[in-house]
């Protein structure tokens, strides 16, 4: 089961990387996996900090978290 969750998480990542911000419904349709697998995998990605989940007017949207850019000052990196 853990392996399958990881596989679906990878599919979610690739879908979001290609499509940007999508609704939960669009995501579930787009990767053509059972809703239970999508939700478990999405939870994993959210817990690991890889995706952001927002809700407005009872519609959930999901997007990849942007990589934080390192700020360089002199010889120090923050």
Where are each of the predicted segments found?
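Short, cationic-aromatic polyanion-contact patches
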Residues: 2-9, 23, 55-78
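Short amphipathic alpha-helical interaction segments
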Residues: 33-44
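Short amphipathic alpha-helical interface segments
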Residues: 5-30
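A short, conserved structural fragment
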Residues: 46-56
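Short loop/turn and capping residues at structural boundaries
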Residues: 27, 39, 56-57
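Short glycine/proline-centered loop/turn elements that form peptide/ligand docking sites
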Residues: 1-2, 44
């Amino acid at each position: 089961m853990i392996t399958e969750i990881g596989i679906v998480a990878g599919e979610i990542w690739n879908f979001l990387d290609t499509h940007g911000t999508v609704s939960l419904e669009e995501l579930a349709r787009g990767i053509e996996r059972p809703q239970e697998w999508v939700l478990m995998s999405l939870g994993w990605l959210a817990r690991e900090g890889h995706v952001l989940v927002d809700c407005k007017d009872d519609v959930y949207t999901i997007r990849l978290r942007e990589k934080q850019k390192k700020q360089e000052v002199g010889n120090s990196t923050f």
